Amino acid sequence: PSTSAPAGVLNAVQNIMMRDRMGYTDAFGIPRLRQRIARHYHEQYGVDVSPDNVMVTTGSSGAFILSFLASFDVGDRVALTSPSYPAYRNILAALGIEVIDIPVDIEINFQPNVEVLSRAIETAEGKVDGLVIASPSNPTGTMLGPSELSDIVTYCHDQDIRLISDEIYHGITYERPAQTARAYGREMIVISSFSKYFS
């Protein structure tokens, strides 16, 4: 994340700027870019994604704001692991959405599982409308394994909980490749980021 943009990207931007080819793009992003992102999901994860289901935003923070606005109403309740990325909580609070904490610790690799998730939701006493997961996690760097991720996707589907999967750190893994939640279902929002993945 602290490196500069690749030379090829800088050169392409310079060429576009010099040719004065600036202007508005499609609201969901440049079609060729959306097609390439869909192809990336097929090449990297073996998952077929339609370019129609790809939206390009100005950074992942913009994606989180738009995803939360599209998925939740004022007064809805969204579960987050504790610890988790502080901006989730701040954005949700600004939108009038209640945060339900899911305590996680080293014993469960600082990641939720269905048992912990069920217990947190029961303790919350009432409907939980959403869940945000991050694998790899910020701040802990831990990842969900394929079976854990699959179980969470199934649980959210069965409980009618909107799942948002933060996958912006997929380009920074060490022991094993990260899995996308999209491999286990279609009814979620997956957020990724160029600045982390391709840095």
Task: List each model region and its residues.
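Short acidic capping loops at alpha-helix termini that bridge into adjacent secondary structure
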Residues: 48-54, 74-77, 186-187
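A short helix->loop->beta-strand "cap" motif at the edges of active sites that frequently abuts
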Residues: 76, 97, 158-162, 186
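A short helix-loop-beta submotif of the ANL/AMP-binding
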Residues: 94-100
